[in-house]
Amino acid sequence: MTFNLKRTFLMSAAILGLGVATMNNTTNVKAENIKYDNVYGANQNYRRYEATDMTLNNADVISSKEFDSTVNEASDNSYVSVKQNGSVNFVAKEGADGLTVRYTVPDGSTSKISVLVNGKKVKTFNLDSKWAWQYVDGDNVYDSPRENGHARFRFDEVHGFFGVHVNKGDHVTIQNEEGSLGLDFVELENVEAPKKQPANSISLADFGAKSGQDSTQALKEAIKQAREKHKVLYIPEGQYLINDKIGIDGDGLTITGAGMWYTDLHFTSNEAGKGGFNIGHDSNNLTFSHFSMSSELTSRYQQNAQYKAFAGSLGKNSKIDSLWIEHFECGAWIGDYANAHDMKYTDGLVIENSRIRNNLADGVNLAQGTKNSVVRNSNVRGNGDDSLASWASIADGTESAITESNVFEHNTIELGWRAGGIGIFGGKNHKITNNLIKDNRGGAGIRISTVFDGHNFDLNDNGIEVNNNQIVKSGTTNDFYGLKRGSFDFERVKGDIRNIRLNNNNIVDGVVDDVTKNFELTNESVKISNNTHSNDKAIQNINQLTHQEISEKENYTLYYFDGEHEQDGKVVRYWTPKSSNIKIESWMTYSNSKDKKVYNFTNEDVPSFLPEEKTKFLKDYVYQGEQEKNGNIIRFWSKK
């Protein structure tokens, strides 16, 4: 969806019949008015091109709804496997300067892609698995495989400039130069010009900082001088290497860059506690805007990484605006952890117009009494815990007040691989409104629970509103604890849930139930009204080779998804058997069954041969099914 200021949320709301009273209740913080393009989700000035919709060369569409399949983390449950020297091609529907590629490569490996425009190579990206691939076992997340670990965080992203301007109608090709490669989608963006140094400012360059070099001391000194002289700190174009956590302490400081595509603070340490901004609890009226933050962090350190892009209390009326935050423990964890007599609360924080992606844990968590704060008009994608959360925590020794009146509005939240799209854990008077939550298959779309210690919902007298959200293809059959989670999930463990109002939400193609719960919902606890779901179309599945219908009970992990179209009021989906891409070689061993040779393969996106004499099938594998090809039987197995 492209950014068009002429289409406002007000117009969209009028078309869809949303009342003025509904819109007036979408925020309770003082912040500038944003005109929204859509009823659901954030504005975005980029256009997405799904790899499955592209022209494929030596590449295959991979589709599955199996819980542990790589496809489970892909947009719309499908991606494209591109063989070496294979490619995908598409036509740009509008002009662009930059692109973002979402990809997967095997754990411990690298790959390389070339980008061509109208057949001419203009860009090369080196792809690396090092920030990705975590293994989840209940509460624990590991950096390497475990016996009961579920592989997750298998997709990552890379972005950069084409080096040329891409015009509408140009042909864009992504070619795999080396290694194993899966492509989920490509996003093209018309990038605005870099922002110039503002008035009454000092530049990081004035302190000797240079792009590509360590700038830690320069940044610390520049922050000190900006605070003392009441100047804005401007960070010009470039990637500045930072090898330590940066402390911010004081009122009224503004740090701004040339734009999220131009200015990057790259934290170079992979050690716990050595990256991000740590906000001192006497700070107020802080502004961080128009730059990106990235890091070398690759581990949660058993939930002790202490490596968040932003951590601490931001005091009163602070703002995080137009930042691109990637590869941290969390995007922002907001809360003070001082002793009870010295607690300072975040009040009136605005996080907006930002991209918070591919972090190991939460996107944003408003904790420790944070109030009157809002996250809005942001894209939160590919994170490894709740994408957006408000937790009424009471850390040891703090006696923290309750979180209250926080707002999550008009965010696009997608592809979370663990926990909820949005999580509300206690508190009062919050609003969750007009968000688009899509492909959140690590947990519920929106979860409301008392599973964690802290304030529950006992003080929630005025109610928490969950209105006008759309939840698409979200929920899970297994939350890593053996429980299914619906588009909405309610879990009562350490206190009652009360005064929650779900109204005018839309659920599309939920993975499991619309609502899952561990207690009976009443109007006093959760009032549900005027919610709809849009997944009632009949679906017919067709084998592309035989043109015969496939039973709904068939194991669809034995097939590649080849697209769909709507016909006579139903959706027709096309599937190609995995056996069609398997080539039987003379050296392959086999057994016999009723005069037919039986060959064994793994049930991966790209099946691997399993030799009869070296494989302990019943001990190490689970039988998935079989298909016939050229008079032979291809038997598929998945590793236990």
Task: Show the residue positions of the predicted features.
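Extracellular beta-strand-rich, repetitive "passenger/adhesive" scaffolds
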Residues: 85, 177, 230-239, 257-263, ...
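Non-cytosolic beta-sheet module surface loops
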Residues: 92-94, 103-107, 176-178, 226, ...
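Acidic Gly/Asp/Thr-rich repetitive segments characteristic of extracellular carbohydrate-active
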Residues: 204-236
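Extracellular beta-strand-rich solenoid/capping regions of secreted or surface-exposed proteins
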Residues: 220, 225, 241-255, 264-290, ...
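Extracytoplasmic
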Residues: 32-200, 556-562, 566, 593
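Sec-dependent N-terminal signal peptides of Gram-positive bacterial secreted proteins and lipoproteins
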Residues: 2-26
